[in-house]
């Protein structure tokens, strides 16, 4: 049997880029909670002892940006210079302006357009992907890398591994078989974890704890064998981390946010953007379309693309590829998709309830992936029933 290796990586919530994603989405949540029509494009950057939020926001909400930044950093665990950032004493810079009136008139007519008339906030193309290899209908390599990152944070916060610090990265290589276009995972080939730690712990203790408390609970036993390779903190030392170790920026982890290198990506990031930004809303609706195709048995694996022009409500194109796994021809699947999903940005916002912020709704998406999550706030993960004639 022919097999191949495929690798996906993830980072946990203390990684500087992910810290920035979470701050940007915390700002979005705060804006939408008070004013669902907020127009938000919020970027964040960070380096030693400094966080800056900047961008374009038009909102009726009263926002304390500095408090949001400090609260988000503190919740993640950045509570001292030792761990990479001190939430209560770092510099917080804010440079927020209003949305360009040129963009506002073209997209939503300064809030006068009806939902079905709202144009895309920018041009671009987005992809949605689904595969039947996991219950989440997501790629296994991505699911495992993501869950390892989440578990690292869990055992840090609950005290199981008190030597852990917030920053960390994971990577999983899976051996696959291509079954007529569908992906069948056979085993985990390599597990890599690099996690920030304090000065007190030895490399042997790190490796033992990671195997026992992180890898064992996350990776099903059936995928591990005596040949599985483990690289656990292979650099030998990772004490300096967070923004002290590396600069961070919103939108730098778009593959981790989506499908771990599977499918395709149009390049647009998600965090800090309201639903008129099709980078986000367009990607969410095509995930729902792809997932619904697989869940309804139309195909075992599927990718959907949508594209937009700024100010134009209707998509320019919709594309479907079932990688040869479709039960009916792709052109018929495409017809079903177009009949069942409304790709106009104003309607996506209504149908997926994307103008509802607050309670960490979008903040939750900003670490551990936007897709394949079992949470009612992730409305784009709800499978739509699709009617089709079985051949």
Swiss-Prot record:
GO terms for molecular function: ATP binding; metal ion binding; methionine adenosyltransferase activity. Keywords: ATP-binding, Cobalt, Cytoplasm, Magnesium, Metal-binding, Nucleotide-binding, One-carbon metabolism, Potassium, Transferase. Mg(2+) binds at residue 9. GO terms for cellular component: cytoplasm. K(+) binds at residue 43. ATP binds at residues 15, 167-169, 235-238, 246, 252-253, 269, 273, 277. InterPro entries: ADOMET_SYNTHASE_CS, S-AdoMet_synt_C, S-AdoMet_synt_central, S-AdoMet_synt_N, S-AdoMet_synthetase, S-AdoMet_synthetase_sfam. Its EC number is 2.5.1.6. Pfam families: S-AdoMet_synt_C (PF02773), S-AdoMet_synt_M (PF02772), S-AdoMet_synt_N (PF00438). Its cofactor is Mn(2+); Mg(2+); Co(2+); K(+). It is found in: Cytoplasm. Pathway: Amino-acid biosynthesis; S-adenosyl-L-methionine biosynthesis; S-adenosyl-L-methionine from L-methionine: step 1/1. L-methionine binds at residues 56, 99, 246, 277. CDD domains: S-AdoMet_synt. PROSITE patterns: ADOMET_SYNTHASE_1 (PS00376), ADOMET_SYNTHASE_2 (PS00377). One of its GO terms (biological process) is one-carbon metabolic process. It catalyses: L-methionine + ATP + H2O = S-adenosyl-L-methionine + phosphate + diphosphate. Binds 2 divalent ions per subunit. The metal ions interact primarily with the substrate. Can utilize magnesium, manganese or cobalt (in vitro). It comes from the Eukaryota. Catalyzes the formation of S-adenosylmethionine from methionine and ATP. The reaction comprises two steps that are both catalyzed by the same enzyme: formation of S-adenosylmethionine (AdoMet) and triphosphate, and subsequent hydrolysis of the triphosphate. Homotetramer. Belongs to the AdoMet synthase family. This is S-adenosylmethionine synthase 5. It comes from Vitis vinifera. The gene is METK5.
């Amino acid at each position: 049997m022919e097999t191949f290796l495929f690798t996906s990586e993830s980072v946990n919530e203390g990684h500087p880029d992910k810290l920035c994603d979470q701050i940007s989405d915390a700002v979005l949540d705060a804006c939408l909670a008070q004013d669902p029509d907020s127009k938000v494009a919020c970027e964040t950057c960070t380096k030693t002892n400094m966080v800056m939020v900047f961008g374009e926001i038009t909102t009726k909400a009263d926002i304390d940006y500095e408090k949001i930044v400090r609260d988000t950093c503190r919740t993640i665990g950045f509570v001292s210079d030792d761990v990479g950032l001190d939430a209560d004493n770092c510099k917080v810079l804010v440079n927020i302006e209003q949305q360009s009136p040129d963009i506002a008139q073209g997209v939503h007519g300064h809030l006068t357009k009806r939902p079905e008339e709202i144009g895309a906030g920018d041009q671009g193309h987005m992809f949605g992907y689904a595969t039947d290899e996991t219950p989440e209908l997501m790629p296994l390599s991505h699911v495992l890398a993501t869950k390892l990152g989440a578990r690292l944070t869990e055992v840090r916060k609950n005290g199981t591994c008190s030597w852990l610090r917030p920053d960390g990265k994971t990577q999983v290589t899976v051996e696959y078989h291509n079954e007529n276009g569908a992906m069948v995972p056979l085993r985990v080939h390599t597990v890599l974890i690099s996690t920030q730690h304090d000065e007190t712990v030895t490399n042997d203790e790190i490796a033992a704890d990671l195997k026992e408390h992180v890898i064992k609970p996350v990776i099903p036993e059936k995928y591990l064998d005596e040949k599985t390779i483990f690289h656990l903190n292979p650099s030998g030392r990772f004490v300096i981390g967070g923004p002290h170790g590396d600069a961070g920026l919103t939108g730098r982890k778009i593959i981790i946010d989506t499908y771990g290198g599977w499918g395709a990506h149009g390049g647009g990031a998600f965090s800090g953007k309201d639903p008129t930004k099709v980078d986000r809303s367009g990607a969410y609706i095509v995930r729902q379309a792809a997932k619904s195709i697989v869940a309804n048995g139309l195909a075992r694996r599927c990718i959907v693309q949508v594209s937009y022009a700024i100010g134009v409500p209707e998509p320019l194109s919709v594309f479907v590829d079932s990688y040869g796994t479709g039960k009916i021809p792709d052109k018929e699947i495409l017809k079903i998709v177009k009949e069942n999903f409304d790709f106009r940005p104003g309607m996506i916002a209504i149908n997926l309830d994307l103008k509802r912020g607050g309670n960490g709704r979008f903040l939750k998406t900003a670490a551990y992936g936007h897709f394949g999550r079992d949470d009612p706030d992730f409305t784009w993960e709800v499978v739509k029933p699709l009617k089709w004639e079985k051949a």
